[in-house]
Amino acid sequence: MMGKSVWVFAALFPAVLAADIYVSPDGSDDAAGTIDAPLQSIQLAVDQATAGSTIYLRGGTYTPTSNIQITKSGTASAPYVLRAYEGESVIIDGEELPGTPADLDASLDNADRGILHIQDAEYWEFYDLELINGPYGVYARDASNNHYERITTRNNYETGFQLQGESSNNVVLYLDSYGNRDPRKNGESADGFACKEGSGEGNILRGARLWNNVDDGLDLWYAVNPVHPRISANTSREFKSAVTIEDTIAWGNGFNRWDFTPFEGDGNGFKLGGGDDTDIGPADHIITNCIAFSNAKDGFTDNSQPGNFVLTRNTAWDNTAVGFKFGTAVATLTGNIAASNGEAPTSLSDEQISDGNSWDGDEDWDDGSFVSVDVSLVQGERNADGTIEPSGFLLPADGEEIGATTDWSA
């Protein structure tokens, strides 16, 4: 009889096993981790947390000397949560971590990548965190079923947010990633958001802004000889599964703001593939309601990816080279706009399926074709829920319902 009573109690009151934990830059690791007696170390809070726990970070700047390792998993019904406390501003400054910056041509050990290093971990949720000056901001490897919302990754010494390895069903919502650069590679690989070297279905990037990064805004390329204990040094892999990208804006990427010599940055808004020709496999990416503007190279490019893409109502404006460049993928392009790009609106092979796009008609599209080309309309502070204010930015002046809109609730 007692055994049954214990089971009923555990079923009715599981939360007693998952206490919330509080952390503050002014806390103490000898404290209890309560709101009145917070810990100081985020890592200690992560280590003490159990599935279902919420770790609340009080406002201020945290300056860890080793990165935050997240290597355990919650469950769908009892996820771990790491978040800022009730609207307070939380900055995690990685300037004291290894690789900030690494020397030119130096390698960066897998374990040292990221202010948040998330590996072999599932069912975590992250909210309202700002990650700066780190060896990557967020580095998630072999990590699935995680949720990231209203994260800022800026001025890191590698890619702001990188998802890698066998990773699936991750949602990245309302990411701001900007000013990321890589002195160890002279600009070759620091992107705003990257999904590389692996596979996994169900990954979604939505509502991101990716700007002024040294390489690309978004990069789905893969790197040669990744540093990982389970991968041969002679192996190279791209991300070989579909990624869904929605309501995302990339601008100002690929310019040498750091005086790197020689400069190796690419400067695409959305680079949707690439890598070693002997190892490329098709990935059927879906890109909807995205904008690429004022990037140093192309707006949207397959970069040798052979998948079947679907691009619906996207806009490429004022990029230095080509708006939409697809030669190896077979892309179904519907309702997209290319205007005022430096070299050409498009560069499309005969295999592309194009219908109802700006270049399919007789009209010549230029700045005057839009309600507004005021870039400040998509810059600045977000709304509390992570959206940006809807505006007339790059909307067709004649009211035609093509191209991207900044009304992300539509």
Curated annotation (Swiss-Prot):
Q: Which GO terms describe its biological process?
A: symbiont-mediated disruption of host cell wall
InterPro entries listed in its UniProt record: Pectin_lyas_fold, Pectin_lyase_fold/virulence, Pel9A-like_beta_helix, Polysaccharide_Lyase_9
Relay the pH-dependence remark from the record.
Answer: Optimum pH is 8.
Annotated positions binding Ca(2+)? 191, 215-216, 219
Coiled coil feature spans: none
GO cellular component assignments: extracellular region
Q: Which residues form the active site?
A: 271
Range of residues in the leader sequence: 1-18
Keywords, A to Z, come to:
Calcium, Glycoprotein, Lyase, Metal-binding, Secreted, Signal
What's the protein called, per UniProt? Pectate lyase PEL9
Give the organism, scientific name.
Answer: Emericella nidulans (strain FGSC A4 / ATCC 38163 / CBS 112.46 / NRRL 194 / M139)
> In the UniProt record, what gene is named as encoding this protein?
PEL9
